[in-house]
Amino acid sequence: MAAGLCACNDEYTFVPEYEVKLPTDTTINVTIDASTVYQTIDGFASSDAWDMEYVGKYWSTSNKEAIAKLLFSREVDDKGNSQGIGLSMWRFNLGGGSEEQGDASGIVSDKKERRVDCFLTSANGSYDWSKSAGRRYFMEKAKEYGCESFVLFSNTPPVYYTYNGQARSDKGAFSNLKTEHYGDFADFLATCAKHFVDEGYNITHISPINEPQYNW
């Protein structure tokens, strides 16, 4: 959902088409057996990867608010149409510092939206919580709309802790995290989680290894 919305540009106000056009003679029969249980779903989620940073930073306030409404609202209009999909979980990407590296990150320029900055500014443990402003905008909107659960996920450790100094492995199925920095990476995740908890976010999950060998 987020990816589809963010693929459009900011030259016009996005207006969703709520009413599905069906032939008048169409009949749809749906049978729901509430007694049959298949699984337990903890939440309905999406994430801010990848373009939400640019949308949150550079798009107009009206369009950003419209996107947030589509993602998080559970209200219905006077015709019974949902104002949004009512996400109950939001996944926030804890970047590793590839954005600060630019082309040196090894993430090619035509995929530069996949470069993500890092709250940790150096290996000595200093943090800059003003980073990822665009993605934090949507995280805040999720909270305002009543999103119950937030997941922090990481595609890479901070680049200070990796073998090749990048936010991607260049050796295929190979861990890029130096063994001597396992504890440092855990501290990074815990520090970020505590920060957002202190900011009023209900951090329910931490996913430290997300898509570890995706070739980007």
What are these regions (language model features)?
Residues D25-A34:
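Boundary/junction segments of secreted and surface-exposed precursor proteins
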Residues Y12-T13, F119, Q213:
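Intrinsically disordered, low-complexity regions of eukaryotic proteins
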Residues G4-T26:
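Bacterial Sec-dependent N-terminal signal peptides
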